Amino acid sequence: MNILKISLAVLTIGSILSADSIDDKFQSLVGKSLFIGNSSNLHSGHYEYGKEGGNQPELSDSGITIPYYFGDKGDLWRPFVMGGIGYSKMEEENSNLRDTGDDIELTSLYYKIGGGLTYNPTCDFSFVVGGSALVMNTDGDYTTKTPLTTSEGDQKIKKLFDSETTNSIYDGYGGFVYKPTIYGYKSELKSNLHYLKMNFDNGIDDVDGIYLDVMAKVRSNELTTIFCQPVWIEHYVKGDFVNSKLADVIGFNSAVSVGSTLHWRVGPLIPIIKDSRLRDLNVALNVQKTISNRDFEGWKAGVGFSLVKF
């Protein structure tokens, strides 16, 4: 009888620990997707978490955020709004949730809205405050060689990883932008301090924290012209620094990204926008590599559009 009581107690403790680990896994995988989708430095890339050959989640993200500034460039105060949409896929093979080598796939579509205010005391220096909200709708697919049972742990796995969930991240930030010309080269220094809060579905604990992003960029002079429009290149270094509370969810304390963007001005070639605010539209080719202090690394490469005046 005593042996039976002890066995039942062990099973009860085991199920509680399993439920906690399932919550942590959901918080970690979805939290990574939320952070990357929200990050101006890291979104639209492919990233790996963990060592080769081990439990190694992989995330692919693709999105676009478009800001709109009211007023004119020389105005002292300029409010702005932004809107964006994106898609991400988080995959983890041979998950350690169960001992059966199961696979997790979380496919998400997200929407982002926000706005803020810039203060421009000089032509090359600005302060900014703003905020945004990103809502992510996630469709989970849990693949297992051993069917899920009616146990509490397995049913929680089904609820979180084999169903649809809605999660979100809220971002309040303030920072500055400085655009000096150094030895004839246009440069840019930028930094923002963020307060982030992640909200998770199904009663999973929220996570909040502070993080700092920085960027240093230098622009070349005109390299050549195509159809009489300038082509130039930018080289940059970006950094993301996260407090420990947030780092445990997103998988790193500090990350550094190095990249280049090739721009070709096309706005004047398009009749319907050549005399509008979109006249500075460029086709942009970007390549970036990211490393971190933990087992987080990634890259991104793609063709898009930019609104940068040459």
Model-based region annotation:
Residues 201-310:
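Outer membrane beta-barrel transmembrane domains
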Residues 9-14, 115-116, 175, 224:
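Small side chains
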Residues 25, 72, 76-218, 237-243, ...:
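Outer-membrane pore/translocation modules
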Residues 29-37, 76-84, 126-130, 186-190, ...:
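Residue-level detector of the transmembrane beta-barrel scaffold of outer-membrane proteins
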Residues 55-57, 66-75, 105-107, 118, ...:
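Subset of outer-membrane beta-barrel
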